Amino acid sequence: MASLKDLEGKWRLVESHGFEDYMKELGVGLALRKMGAMAKPDCIITLDGNNLTVKTESTVKTTVFSCTLGEKFDETTADGRKTETVCTFTDGALVQHQKWEGKESTITRKLKDGKMVVECVMNNAICTRVYEKVQ
């Protein structure tokens, strides 16, 4: 089973399925969904003890959040939502659970065959994005 340390590094998106449907379920407008679907972001994960930083960079937008594992924090997402978020490391996966306005979404990052597989879920919308390590 992977450790959190195994997820640390710079990852580049190489495959994406269902992202536009997931964004639509989140309530993202059409124009931003189209731009988001075209973006090929890098995800940079850094650790300092129990402190986690996740930076997502693309030509469209760069977002960063930092948190302490297991503690709630206020996150502003790439699409502008203000969420109450908690990140945990459970069963070899980094789980990011967001809550806002009575809604919930979960983003799970885990290693599979040397790649980082990210699953984004809200209601029945499920998105899978695959990243390869570049650093």
From Swiss-Prot:
Function: Intracellular carrier for long-chain fatty acids and related active lipids, such as endocannabinoids, that regulate the metabolism and actions of the ligands they bind. In addition to the cytosolic transport, selectively delivers specific fatty acids from the cytosol to the nucleus, wherein they activate nuclear receptors. Delivers retinoic acid to the nuclear receptor peroxisome proliferator-activated receptor delta; which promotes proliferation and survival. May also serve as a synaptic carrier of endocannabinoid at central synapses and thus controls retrograde endocannabinoid signaling.
Chemical reaction(s) catalysed: hexadecanoate(out) = hexadecanoate(in); (9Z,12Z)-octadecadienoate(out) = (9Z,12Z)-octadecadienoate(in); (9Z)-octadecenoate(out) = (9Z)-octadecenoate(in)
GO molecular function: fatty acid binding; identical protein binding; long-chain fatty acid transmembrane transporter activity; retinoic acid binding
Family of this protein: Belongs to the calycin superfamily. Fatty-acid binding protein (FABP) family.
Binding site for N-eicosanoyl ethanolamine: 43, 109, 131
Organism: Rattus norvegicus (Rat)
Compartments where located: Cytoplasm; Nucleus; Synapse; Postsynaptic density
Domain topic, free-text comment: Forms a beta-barrel structure that accommodates hydrophobic ligands in its interior.
Modification type N-acetylalanine: residues: 2
Example GO biological process: lipid metabolic process
Major localization listed first in the record, in broad terms: cytoplasm
Alphabetized UniProt keyword annotations: Acetylation, Cytoplasm, Disulfide bond, Lipid transport, Lipid-binding, Nucleus, Phosphoprotein, Secreted, Synapse, Transport
Modified positions (Phosphoserine) in chain numbering: 3
Binding site for (9Z,12Z)-octadecadienoate: 129-131
Protein name as catalogued: Fatty acid-binding protein 5
